[in-house]
Curated annotation (Swiss-Prot):
Matches recorded under Pfam families: PMSI1
The record's account of how the chain is modified after translation: Phosphorylation sites are present in the extracellular medium.
Function, in words: Involved in control of cellular proliferation. Onconcogenic modifier contributing to the tumor suppressor function of DNMT3B.
Main localization, broad class: secreted
Endpoints of the signal sequence: 1-22
Annotated Polar residues bias: 162-182
Domain of life, source organism: Eukaryota
Protein's UniProt name: Protein MENT
Entry keywords, A to Z: Phosphoprotein, Secreted, Signal
Length: 344
C-alpha cells in the first residue's frame, strides 16, 4: 500500500508542476498571445464596421485585449500597436457612414429597397444591424426630419441642409395667378396675363354693318339718271365710313323722273320716265305747248360734249380708287351676309 500511495502522490506532484509551469509561461509572455489576437481583430483594408453592428461580447473582448496590451509598456509589439491605434481611429473617422440601427424609423428608406446614387448597401440577409457606407462626402440618405449630414470626417465642420420629405409635396395649381406670374422669360419682370382692352378691335362676329337712312336724290339730267346714297358704320366702332366706300350697297342709281328732277321735258332728258303727265290736263298742256319731236332727233340719253382727255396721273389714281372700292365692296358683302351674334 505504501509504494502505491507514494506513486500516486508523485504523479499528483508532477501534474501540479506542469500546470504551474504553463501558467508561469503564459504570465511571463502575455503580449504575444494578445498581439496575435489583436492582429486578427483589426482589418484596416476591409470595410469599417459600426460599433452598433458588432456583438457586445466581442466588443468586451476587444476592450479587454487592448487593456492588456496597453498595460505592457516594455514590449515592442505592444508599443507599435499603441501607436497604430490613433491612425486606425483617424482612418475610421474618414469613412462617412452610419449604422442602420441609428435610424429611429425604418420607413425612411424607399419601400422598394433602392438607394440614392453614390451609396453602397452592405445589408445582408442576417438579422444583425445593417451598416450603410457612402462613397462620397456629400451624398447621404435623409433622416426622419428631412436632414442629412455632410463632411462628417471633421467633427468641427458639420453641414446640415433642410430638405422636404417626398410626402410633403403639394399639388401645384397651374391655373392660379401666382403660378402664372412665376412663369416668364428669364430676366423679365413677372406680370399677370394682360386684361382685355376696352378700345381694342372687337372680334369679327361682333362686327356688323349698320346703314343710315337714304339721302336726297341727285339728278343727272344729261345722262338720264338719278342717284342717292346713304352713310353707314360698323357696329362696335366709333365714327362713320366714307359715303362712296360701298357703292354697290349704299348707292342707288335709277332712271330720272320729271317728278323728282327738274329736267327739260322738251329734250327728253328723262326718256325712261313712265309717268309722263299721268293726269289729263298735263297731256293737253304738253300737246298744246310743244310739238312732237321727230324720232330721229330723240337721243337716249344725250351724251355730253366731248371733253379733253384727263392727264395720265389723274386716270391712274382713278383706277386705284375704283380698285380699292371693289375690294371694300367684297369685304362688306361678307359682313352683310353674316348675321350678328348677340351676347347675353
Amino acid at each position: 500500500m505504501v509504494p502505491a500511495a507514494c506513486m500516486l502522490l508523485w504523479a499528483l506532484l508532477l501534474s501540479l508542476e506542469s500546470r504551474a509551469a504553463g501558467a508561469e509561461d503564459q504570465k511571463t509572455n502575455p503580449t504575444a498571445t494578445t498581439v496575435r489576437m489583436q492582429r486578427v481583430s483589426f482589418h484596416f483594408g476591409g470595410p469599417a464596421r459600426s460599433l452598433r453592428s458588432t456583438n457586445p461580447t466581442a466588443r468586451t473582448s476587444i476592450s479587454r485585449k487592448l487593456r492588456v496590451t496597453l498595460e505592457d509598456e516594455n514590449d515592442a509589439l505592444a508599443t507599435a500597436d499603441r501607436l497604430a491605434v490613433p491612425a486606425a481611429a483617424e482612418l475610421l473617422s474618414t469613412v462617412t457612414g452610419y449604422s442602420r440601427s441609428s435610424l429611429s424609423n425604418s420607413g425612411d428608406w424607399e419601400e422598394d429597397g433602392s438607394l440614392e446614387e453614390g451609396v453602397v448597401d452592405t445589408r445582408k440577409t442576417t438579422n444583425n444591424p445593417i451598416t450603410i457606407f457612402s462613397t462620397t462626402n456629400t451624398v447621404g440618405s435623409s433622416s426622419t426630419t428631412g436632414r442629412f449630414v455632410a463632411n462628417s470626417q471633421e467633427r468641427e465642420i458639420r453641414l446640415t441642409t433642410d430638405m422636404r420629405s417626398p410626402s410633403s409635396k403639394t399639388t401645384v395649381d397651374l391655373s392660379s395667378e401666382t403660378t402664372l406670374q412665376q412663369w416668364s422669360t428669364p430676366g423679365s419682370t413677372p406680370s399677370p396675363w394682360p386684361k382685355p382692352s376696352l378700345t381694342a378691335m372687337p372680334s369679327p362676329e361682333d362686327l356688323r354693318v349698320v346703314l343710315m337712312p337714304w339721302g336726297p336724290w341727285h339728278c343727272h339730267c344729261k345722262s338720264g339718271t338719278m342717284s342717292r346714297s346713304r352713310a353707314g358704320k360698323l357696329h362696335g366702332l366709333s365714327g362713320r365710313l366714307r359715303v362712296g366706300a360701298l357703292n354697290e350697297l349704299r348707292t342707288e342709281h335709277r332712271p330720272c323722273t320729271y317728278q323728282l328732277c327738274t329736267c327739260n321735258r322738251q329734250l327728253e332728258e328723262c326718256p325712261l320716265d313712265s309717268s309722263l303727265c299721268t293726269d289729263h290736263s298735263c297731256s293737253t298742256h304738253v300737246a298744246s305747248t310743244i310739238s312732237p319731236i321727230p324720232v330721229h332727233l330723240r337721243r337716249r340719253p344725250i351724251l355730253p360734249p366731248t371733253s379733253p382727255s384727263p392727264s395720265p396721273a389723274l386716270a391712274f389714281w382713278k383706277r386705284v380708287r375704283i380698285g380699292l372700292e371693289d375690294i371694300w365692296n367684297s369685304l362688306s358683302s361678307v359682313f352683310t351676309e353674316t348675321q350678328p351674334i348677340e351676347r347675353t
